[in-house]
Design a protein with these regions (language model features):
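A short alpha-helical cap/connector motif
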Residues: 1-158, 165-186, 191-229
Length: 229
């Protein structure tokens, strides 16, 4: 799989996960089509039934968005990266590769703090990250991110929000004070689920809250926000 990483070992793992994700996407399409047909479809992607269904699914960030995460992390020299929603570790691999490459180039230390509420997913993520050779740059915290992220261990350079929508704003409330000046925050799918994300977008789009924010209208939309002084 060709990515911006230029890392054959990581790309082999990503290719396997991409294939697994494609198979699961077909299954997910059938699931949501059936729901629509039976008029039970809800726009709330975090409903109990949906949560059960996606419990063992990758629902990984799109490769282009992962490439962008890598590139932005490299651009700002990110060393402390936090991710809300690790799943099987796809985006984590990109983030960890960025931190590793920054450390290789400039020396010092760096870490990606992943968060995953499903212990089995966290185990699988750890195995995938190890296979990609990136374990020294990742710590996956198992549990509810609203708790596990209360102390990220220092000023955070980059935050990826890619998880269940109703929890994104509460996690942002935990993380905002821990972001360094100039930190970047990426939040996925804000256009596709515009209404559901309104509590989050109204926060980051209001300069009074200390952020400047833009929407990248691509594949469901990606909100990119910068923490100001
Ligand atoms: C969209 S997936 C993340 C995909 C991942 N970023 C990737 O690219 O592979 C969202 C993940 O968030 C996890 N999650 C849901 N609620 C959580 C919570 N309260 N704390 C931590 N993780 C949670 C889910 O189990 C799921 O695996």
């Amino acid at each position: 799989m060709k990515t911006v990483l230029c890392d054959a070992r990581a790309e082999a793992v990503l290719a396997r996960l991409d294939e697994q994700g494609r198979q699961q996407s077909a299954e997910m399409r059938r699931y949501y089509d059936a729901k629509r047909e039976s008029a039970k479809r809800t726009t709330d992607p975090a409903s109990k039934h949906d949560m059960d269904f996606v419990r063992d699914k990758l629902v990984a960030l799109d490769p282009e968005k992962c490439d962008l995460c890598y590139t932005l992390c490299r651009a700002i020299g990110a060393r402390r990266v936090v991710e809300f929603g690790t799943s099987f570790g796809v985006s984590t691999i990109y983030l960890a590769a960025a931190v590793r490459d920054t450390v290789r180039e400039r020396g010092g230390e760096g870490i990606v703090i992943g968060t995953e509420i499903e212990p089995r997913k966290a185990e699988i993520a750890a195995a995938n990250i190890a296979e990609a050779g990136l374990s020294p740059f990742v710590e996956v915290r198992v549990g509810d991110a609203r708790e596990t992220l209360k102390n990220a261990g220092g000023p955070v350079d980059f935050l990826l929000l890619d998880s269940w929508i109703p929890l994104v704003r509460p996690v942002m409330d935990v993380m905002a004070p821990q972001l360094r000046r100039g930190a970047m925050v990426l939040c996925d799918n804000v256009e596709k689920y515009e209404r559901e994300y309104s509590d989050y977008t109204s926060f980051v789009r209001d300069p009074k809250n200390g952020f400047r924010s833009v929407l990248l209208s691509h594949q469901g939309g990606l909100e990119i926000s910068i923490k100001l002084g």
